[in-house]
Amino acid sequence: VPIYGLAPHHTASEAVDLFTGTTRVAQEFKRRGLSVLANDVATYSEVMADCYIRTDASAIDLGELRATLAELNQLPGKPGYFTRTFCEESRYFQPKNGARVDAIRDVIDESYADSWMRPILLTSLMLAADRVDSTTGVQMAYLKGWAARAHNDLELRLPDLLPGGGSSSRRDALELARELPRTQLMYLDPPYNQHRYFTNYHIWETLMRWDAPEAYGLACKRIDSRDASTKSLYNMKREMPAEMRRLLHSIKADLAVVSYNNESWI
């Protein structure tokens, strides 16, 4: 991917990823030695940024982490909100895996709420669930017939952690851009069109918040998916150009890179 070659070419030692999503670009910047700030408004993005960007793999006890993952893997299933909502009222996961998600997620809050391991354990659980879901990749709908992988057993694995420090935040991109000091490299990957990440990945948002929201429709989306507060101006065709202009005028960077595609409104 060409973006990955920009940092060494421009001798950057720091970068800001304002719409980090699943943190893949931020991870690659960190892997190449940059100090990275990863930001997004989604809770699941913040958790992944805490796991991959803020956590320094060289400064943690990997033995303790592996032992904890092994213990969580041994927990029996305990059906709860996740099983009822995403396995019975909808068909994203097999009930056997939904029950284990419920059990593991409860224990993470009960036993690791203040632990340095929490974002790593949550990321591991999210990725484990992703490997046994029955979707095409986004969570706007589930498959009519079960995906083959959905029959596999849920398994927590150690995420691919990186050495070095970094930081994370969960802020509105424009507000954060106005406050940040000048940086060497700014990466911008905002929503392209009407498709909203909040609804595309509503299960991950619920799994990370663990707030048992009211759900609606066949897809069992969070009820707050209807709220204006969960909608981005980048998802609105008329408002998007002006918001993008405001952002570009607000950032302070030696180099700014914007990622878009041919399905975008700009």
Regions found by a protein language model. Give the residues of each.
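SAM-dependent nucleic-acid methyltransferase catalytic core
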Residues: 78-79, 84-201, 212-230
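Conserved SAM-binding motif I beta-strand of class I
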Residues: 36-40
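Glycine-rich active-site loop/strand segments that organize a redox cofactor
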Residues: 63-84
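Conserved acidic residues
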Residues: 13, 183-184, 254
